[in-house]
Structure formats: structure tokens, C-alpha cells
Amino acid sequence: MTWQAYIDTNLIGSGFISAQILSSADGSSWANSNGFSVSATEAQHILSCFKDSNKASAMGITINNVKNFVLKADDKSIYAKKDAGGVVLVKTNQTILVAVYNSNLQPGAAANACEALGDYLREQGF
């Protein structure tokens, strides 16, 4: 399966409105949904937040120029919220999944879908 297929099938197909797969090494983009792109500055901030989860909690996570309030952050996942939507970020050995949802997808379902793909990618060595 291509990286784009993971986006289209596993994330957008689960109800996310936007998604992107980044390299966990340097933050470069491997695949993204139509019209969605995390900026280089945002990607570097995401990388630093996975190294220091306190930074995520203190500064929040900005995705596509939208600042999200961080609810949970550790070295494997970051959950953040903005109004009725939010973002789920999941880090694997080689990737960072970035998945944005709105009020049509419940936060718990969003976290489960993104975490399930993250678990699968870890099992596959990614």
C-alpha cells in the first residue's frame, strides 16, 4: 500500500477531514490529503514536541495556522483540540501521522482510528 493509500483509506476513510504523513526524522511530507499541508515550521515544532511533551502542553500545536490546545502528550501521541474539532498526532519509528477532525467525528473515535494505523505501521517496522 502506498503512503497516499494509508491517508485516503485509513484516515480520510475513517472520517478525518485532513491528514498528512510526515517523516519522523526530519518532518518532510510523505503523503497528504488534498489541499492539506503542514508547514515546515509546524513540522519542526511537532518533532520537538515529541521529544519534549511538556513543550506541547505549554505551547499547543499549530496545524495549518490553527492553534490547538493540547489535551495529552507523550513520546508516541499528541491529542489536541480546537472548538468542536481537533488533531491527533501519532509517532511511529519512521512516521508521524497528523489527522485533523471536526465535529462530525468524536474525539475518541478519532484517536482510536489514528492510533490503530500507528500500531499497524509499528508492527510493519515503520
From Swiss-Prot:
Subcellular location: Cytoplasm, Cytoskeleton
GO biological process assignments: actin nucleation; chemotaxis to cAMP; negative regulation of actin filament polymerization; positive regulation of actin filament polymerization
Main localization category: cytoplasm
CDD domains in alphabetical order: PROF
Keyword Isomerase among UniProt keywords: no
Protein name: Profilin-3
One annotated Gene Ontology cellular component of this protein: actin cytoskeleton
Family (UniProt): Belongs to the profilin family.
Gene Ontology molecular function, alphabetical: actin binding; actin monomer binding; phosphatidylinositol-4,5-bisphosphate binding
Task of the protein: Binds to actin and affects the structure of the cytoskeleton. At high concentrations, profilin prevents the polymerization of actin, whereas it enhances it at low concentrations. By binding to PIP2, it inhibits the formation of IP3 and DG.
Subunit structure: Occurs in many kinds of cells as a complex with monomeric actin in a 1:1 ratio.
Pfam families: Profilin
Keyword set, alphabetical order: Actin-binding, Cytoplasm, Cytoskeleton
Gene: proC
PROSITE patterns assigned to the protein according to its UniProt record, in alphabetical order: PROFILIN
Gene3D superfamilies, sorted: Dynein light chain 2a, cytoplasmic
